[in-house]
């Protein structure tokens, strides 16, 4: 039996096409993936992300524990509510998961991890917490709704209470705040502004309906994937996994090398990889007809005249740009052009930074 989120019946009311997503019944779309995509780029859309896993880490050693567990450094978080993104690595510097961590107090951090990795994440966190004075608490009674797009904040404000709106007024990107029963965060997975709202399951249907009544368009997994790929955001299991280190996944910016005496899990292996040099994750753009897809081979000739090969990790048709885009893992000697093998022939592509669309506009 697949898991169902508390919003399952609301999806059916909106004629969602449901699919299995890592053991969860989730909406693929509500009729038109393209319309849902454009709604987020041009207006406001919302996603049920209640399948994500919310984990609270509390106790006197919470900061010290997370400084060991994560490649990014939670000690950088000085203002309550501030969040950071980063990887949780194994001893070989492979990525167990990518996650967001919110600093709420010196003894209370909230971590949001992926659904597909829930069981291994919880087991790893529990194992690594031994010897630290921390309590790790999963919060399955909390649902989550992401409201994204240029008009998302205004439409959400019409749903929030006056006290909630006052609590989050002027909140900067990558912050989260408890406002009444809602934990409201300025985070997302689309490259647009908006909120990710953690809500008690008992209130989730009412919040979803209130947002619907404000004209926020429900969006499924299909649009979520094209939006995150346009924004150059990794999808765990496609763009990186335990066989990939963060330097080869465009996550170098999330590694806190300083202070040098912080011995986070995977650090020694990661330093060796950094010194030896790794593959890198790049963006590809193909303006000809056709769609770049996961696992297609990528070829280029390096400066020494040697042919090199990489592979597409994520690819799609970009509704915003009107042509195909992809992320590919390639040797770091790549230049600004390459070829992708499609239907037994090679097609020229441009190589760009893996960030295609931000705030509705071309980003490269």
Swiss-Prot record:
GO cellular component assignments: cytosol; glycine cleavage complex
Gene symbol of the encoding locus: gcvT
Superkingdom of source: Bacteria
One GO process term, biological-process aspect: glycine decarboxylation via glycine cleavage system
Protein keywords: Aminotransferase, Transferase
Main EC class the enzyme belongs to: transferase
Catalytic activity: N(6)-[(R)-S(8)-aminomethyldihydrolipoyl]-L-lysyl-[protein] + (6S)-5,6,7,8-tetrahydrofolate = N(6)-[(R)-dihydrolipoyl]-L-lysyl-[protein] + (6R)-5,10-methylene-5,6,7,8-tetrahydrofolate + NH4(+)
GO molecular function terms listed in the Swiss-Prot or TrEMBL record: aminomethyltransferase activity; transaminase activity
Free-text function comment from the UniProt entry: The glycine cleavage system catalyzes the degradation of glycine.
HAMAP family named among the record's database cross-references: GcvT
Protein EC: 2.1.2.10
Assembly and binders: The glycine cleavage system is composed of four proteins: P, T, L and H.
Lineage of the species this protein comes from: Bacteria, Pseudomonadati, Pseudomonadota, Gammaproteobacteria, Alteromonadales
Name of the protein this chain belongs to: Aminomethyltransferase
Cross-referenced NCBIfam families: gcvT, PRK00389.1
